[in-house]
Amino acid sequence: MDSAETELTPAPEGRKRYSDIFQSLDNLEISLGNVTFDPLAGDPVRREDLEPDKADTATVVTEENSEASSWRDLSPEGPAPLTEEELDLRLIRTKGGVDAALEYAKAWSRYAKELLAWTDKRANYELEFAKSIMKLAEAGKVSILQQSQMPLQYIYTLFLEHDLSLGALALETVAQQKRDYYQPLAAKRMEIEKWRKEFKEQWLKEQKRMNEAVQALRRSELQYIQRREDLRARSQGSPEDPPSQASPGSNKQQERRRRSREEAQAKAHEAEALYQACVREANSRQQDLETTKRRIVSHVRKLVLQGDEVLRRVTLGLFELRGAQAERGPRSFSALAECCVPFEPGQRYQEFVRTLQPGAPPPPSPAFCFQEFTAVVHSFPQDTKKKFSGPLPPRLEEEGSPEPGPWEVASLGSQGIPGSDVDSVGGGSESRSLDSPTSSPGAGARRLVKASSTGTESSDDFEERDPDLGDGIENGVGSPFRKWTLSTAAQTHRLRRLRGPAKCRECEAFMVSGTECEECFLTCHKRCLETLLILCGHRRLPARMSLFGVDFLQLPRDFPEEVPFVITRCTAEIEHRALGLQGIYRVSGSRVRVERLCQAFENGRALVELSGNSPHDITSVLKRFLQELTDPVVPFHLYDAFISLAKTLHADPGDDPGTPNPSPEIIRSLKTLLVQLPDSNYSTLRHLVAHLFRVAARFEENKMSANNLGIVFGPTLLRPPDGPRATGASPVACLLDSGHQAQLVEFLIVHYEQIFGMDELPLASEPLTQDPGLAPACLESSPQHPASLLAQDTQPLTIALDSSPDPKHHSALEKCPEVTPPELATLQRDQREEEVEDTRDGAGDGSSHCPEDLALGAQSRGHFSRQPVKYSRGGVRPVTHQLSSLALVASKLCEETPVTVSAVHRGSLRVRGLGPAAACPEGSPLRRNPLPKHFEITQETARLLSKLNSDAVSRTTCCADPEPEESEEHL
């Protein structure tokens, strides 16, 4: 009212007096309204006369009214509320008013942030509590409804439904609170905070400009004062103009003084102009500062008012929302209490008894009597499974009894009734642990009979099985797992529970619980079975060995001329399903999958399953294997010779790699260089070139010509020495050599028939079978079965007279009758006996010479036998992957014994015992005679080998100089 009266025009004295009277009456009415007693009542009502609950309610209402009145009613003596203009004017006139307004806005934002955090945390707690109550109510409702005819069952069902409805209401309330309270208040807080920072930045900028203007004004004022003082000093110190009769020297001095005075006057005028400009700038900045101050104060006030309005609105909405939620609970509980009042105890029990069907009364129980002992002679132990032949008790003789007696019910319950306490507690044999030794006690326990293995499941005792190994076949036919997805390679193993800590062959991590194969003893995590790449070889898996980044001659092989199994497996898989794939050997595979394949080769060697991998990953593994060899396929000491030959190809236009008929000199020179390669290097290079020849033959499909393959494999097969010998090699020479390398490899691919011979093109070996019954035949990357290899082992020892295609060798043998002494016949018989024994011992590992085995070997690669096979765990360990000493001895014997040349076909490029410079007739195909692949040293074998060595020496002396012309023709 005071603020309203100040804005009105002055009234007459009488009117002013009436307004004071009205104001006094209003104050009196307000003061009388705050009094808590009724003047019309007799005695005031005492608090003790009220009921306890009503007294408490009255106290709460009185306190709330007093607090609300203190917040709502203002005392007449208190300050009147200020208008918006007065608020802004007071802040403007107060020193630091703008900073105070901005600080209040910051405090308001912090206050709103605390409110939001508190409400959000409270809502989260309520949400978790409501979910827990609903979950508990659901479980309790299911448990209560399972019982029938229980007291107050309907009431408690309503109670649980009430909890569910209250929980749903709480969830809805929390969601609505976040939508109606949290989001608007948070948005307003962010808006206020953003504008506060903007206003603060503007205020700081204006203050900085004002300070700069004031400093410039002070500097210009000081400069102006100094210039004026200088001008006054020079004007006062100069004398009056002398007469014209003065000397010329005095005239110069006067002229100098005059110029100095003019300069001082000009500087004074300049300083004065600068000073006036700074004054104007300072006044302008001060006006801008005042304008900014008014604007910032006004906007801050509006932002605070808007924030208060939003806070008031969302708070009212929150209280209404919470009030509606809280009102529902008391009403529901009061309704439940009203429903519970008319319940009579024992009412449900009476209903339960009425539901029973009363029948005829049971006959009275017979009295028990004493029976004397009667001796019974038995000629054999009594069989408890037979029917009892003695006199039955009276109770058992009654077959028409309507219901059993109580002792019969007890006996039946002890045997196990569905739903009885025995099953619930876990007294059944099925509920006990399968690994416990006492899980199957007595003769009545379940015993699993061992069955012959089918290659998929273990036939060990039931106690040794993993609980995860079950009967389910959800993950594939024959899969022993219910939870884990098995890879194709994992399905070939016979898995069982791991019996001790071991190292996983797949991830190279130690484990305590896992799986183990019964035959190859491969250990693996259960989760790693999904990505396992190692097939079961049905014999103990050899230890892990490094294959990448090692010397070429140190790679595991069974005989000197064998191609490394990494190369044979990769090329066989590519030729089986990816010869026509576009970009083969040019597109790189995934780095992660390539690493896994390399690790699988080092862990499982030749037993790696490649059918499920991308062809680009397989080619990347092959290229990486060749690149990381410390000594490449073409040795370092022959690198210069091959590069020189490649340069001659490049120099002669007629010897271009694409020329269909190259010059015979180039072919002869290249064959001479190839003869100098070691045995394994030659076989590997020939195998790789044959594979690339097949790839280039399908150029129209895969877009990989011989030129492209030469670019890919040139720097891999031919590498310059990287040791001290290569210190003088320049980068330019290496760059030029790369072109020659690619050209030479292209030449080898294009002219494979003229260089190696088309009739001896190595056949593409079949990929490793996934059938567990055929897996032993593929062990250790052997291209043949062990039995056939054993038969081949005996051929060099028995000289193989019948297999020689050349009649000249028969004539040479006829000239030397000492070639077949009686000891040699004994040796042949012993070798045959050892062959038969080894074939019988390893019947499951390979094929034999019988017609049935030959027919089985001629079947398709997808054929497998279902006949169960029992493999022994303690079998012979696999051959160590080193250069076999016995194989080297046999190779040496073959080199020293000219008679073994009969086993070599006509037209071979390399002959054992001849030097590397041996030449062959032009156009003859290049062939090699594979040495025995596997030997098993025993005392008897060593004795026979020593005797064979002595016989070979005697034969050498006997056939010292056969006909030279015939041998040259044969070569």
From Swiss-Prot:
Modified residues (Phosphothreonine): 659
InterPro entries, sorted: AH/BAR_dom_sf, C1-like_sf, F_BAR, GMIP/FCHO2-like_FCH, PE/DAG-bd, Rho_GTPase_activation_prot, RhoGAP, RhoGAP_dom
Domain Rho-GAP: 553-756
UniProt GO cellular component terms: cytosol; nucleoplasm; plasma membrane
SMART domains: C1, RhoGAP
Start-end of Acidic residues biased regions: 458-471
Residues found modified as Phosphoserine: 19, 75, 235, 238, 247, 436, 440, 884, 908, 924
Region annotation (Disordered) ranges: 41-79, 231-267, 383-476, 799-865
ZnF Phorbol-ester/DAG-type span: 492-536
Function: Stimulates, in vitro and in vivo, the GTPase activity of RhoA.
Name this polypeptide is given: GEM-interacting protein
UniProt source species: Mus musculus
Lineage: Eukaryota, Metazoa, Chordata, Craniata, Vertebrata
The gene coding this protein: Gmip
